[in-house]
Amino acid sequence: MVIVNRNVDIQNSSTERSTINFANKIILAPMVRVGTLPTRLLALDYGADIVYTEELIDWKFLKSFRVVNDALHTIDYIDKTDGTVVFRTCEQEKKRVVVQLGTSDPKRALMVAKMIEKDVAAIDINMGCPKQFSLKGGMGAALLTQPEKAKSILSTLVQNIKVPITCKIRVFEDVEETVKLAKQLESTGISALGVHGRTIAERPQHPNRCETIKKVAEAVRIPVIANGGSREIENYKDILQFKAQCGASSVMIARAAQGNCSIFRQEGLLDLEEVIMNYLKYSIDYDNSPSNTKYCVQNMLKELQETPRGKKFLECQTLGQIWLVTFTFIKM
């Protein structure tokens, strides 16, 4: 049974928070379904400086209530309609976790930010997601073509929220148009700007536009966080090379971390078996949903899912089954 307390914060959480510095950082990027608590904690263990959540939609937060989970020592935001966890965090990541918010409205964004600001290090507005769900809702990359609305959302948060506000964008075909937008967003007072080096229409198989990111970094004074280089990133040295190529202050890693979170280790990658076991320990310790745990492990196993043992893993339905089958899988 999950024990919750709606009134008392763990470790006397205070509204006074230190400012997170986005300069010269290696960061876990926001990733749908992947950026849940176990992955974030694992990334921090392996050397990530900052970790982003997956994109969380404003109305999902507004349908939730905040509780202190005394059993897990976490802060949970629970959906009022079905009891599922919208967002779970803990003291270990408190000063380094950034919630990425999907929103198209300044008022809703502010309502959510007021709810969560004492539990997070910063709040990021997603202005780069190219998925139809986001575009149809006026969120994500839809905001790239509505700079006034984008600025309104950011300004509202910067002026009313105590933690730093950032945003993440995609580039345009035209470099100057990208630079112009970056300057407009910077003018709102945001603390950093994440830049994915592909357009809305481009996908991971397309080359990352590192030169465009470099032009943005040269044009603004705030830290620019380069993103989109995972195709060429196989180790920590590659991360630094990507950073230099983009001329960026910091780097944000997505797919390379999804496949093996130890990409953040300066000492080099760990065996996938060890990474999976460490991930599963966090999943069990923090009661991560079996479906999400299974999805994240599948992204690590990749083609190994097609082996007989991999197919057995796909049949798992509970955390206990996942642990048992995975433990057997990696020992054989």
Predicted features by range, described:
Residues 1-27, 32, 37-38, 45, ...:
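Alpha/beta catalytic cores of nucleotide-metabolism and tRNA/nucleoside-modifying enzymes
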Residues 2-20, 31-115, 314:
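Glycine-rich, positively charged N-terminal anion/phosphate-binding segment
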Residues 30, 55, 101-103, 127, ...:
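A cross-domain feature marking catalytic cores of carbohydrate-active enzymes
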Residues 53, 122-130, 187-198, 250-257:
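Non-cysteine beta-strand/loop elements that form the S-adenosyl-L-methionine
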Residues 56-62, 106, 127-141, 197-202, ...:
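Conserved radical SAM core fold
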Residues 59, 143, 172-175, 199-206, ...:
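Short, small-residue-enriched loops and turns at beta-alpha junctions
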Residues 69-70, 74, 95, 132-150, ...:
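Glycine-rich tight-turn/loop motif centered on a GG-T
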Residues 76-90, 94-165, 170-178, 183-186:
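Active-site beta->alpha loop and helix N-cap motifs at the rims of alpha/beta catalytic domains
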